Amino acid sequence: IPESVALITKVVREALSGGGVSPQDCAGCCVGMPCYGENPANDREIVRLLTDALTPVPVYVVNDGEVGWAGSLACGEGIHIVSGTGSIAFGRGCDKEFARCGGWVEFFGDEGSCYWIGRQGMSLFSKEADGRLPRGPLYDLVHGEFGLTEDYQFIDRIVREFAPYREKVAGFQRYVLQAARAGDTAAAALYETAALELALMIRTLKAKLRFSA
């Protein structure tokens, strides 16, 4: 948390300086943080550190999904969905009620995201490698990109170079995409499933919230 707050503080101060704006002239600063609203103790620590660091600017902290909604829908009613490294949906109804869906944690959530597709793609390679599924373009693509001479070398590469880094697992998605475009039907099916997962978030929020149209 302290490292994240330090980075945010640096960016805010640079933005103010670049715009020739004094902190005393700011009505407030809204900060969108991943995972905010999920752990009360962490939430309090984030608010405390940001408030101390950005004084005298008033600070308002929300989940980053809410910031995305505010930017994409100009704070109006509707549903904003994110599908990047992770996934989350955030919406506001016509009665100004808010709701979110998804965005739990990559270990068991983030369905439809690049991280989710990356993990599923790694599993798909293992199935194509040992015969549980017919070998498609993903098998040869991974062998070539990773310089594998034997299938099980994939395990050590993933455990050492990918598993500790969320963004690298998400980055594996590009191999799945290349394979799907090359005709790997199992890889293409992952994107169909991802689309269904994202659509489920939208349908869920649509049922939870009231909209004027």
Segments and roles (model prediction):
Residues C29-P34:
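Short glycine-rich or small-residue beta-strand-to-loop segments that form or flank ligand, phosphate
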Residues I1-G28, L49-V57, G71-I79, S123-A213:
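ATP-binding/phosphotransfer module of carbohydrate and carboxylate kinases, centering on a glycine-rich
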Residues G37-R135:
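Phosphate-binding/catalytic loop of phosphoryl-transfer enzymes
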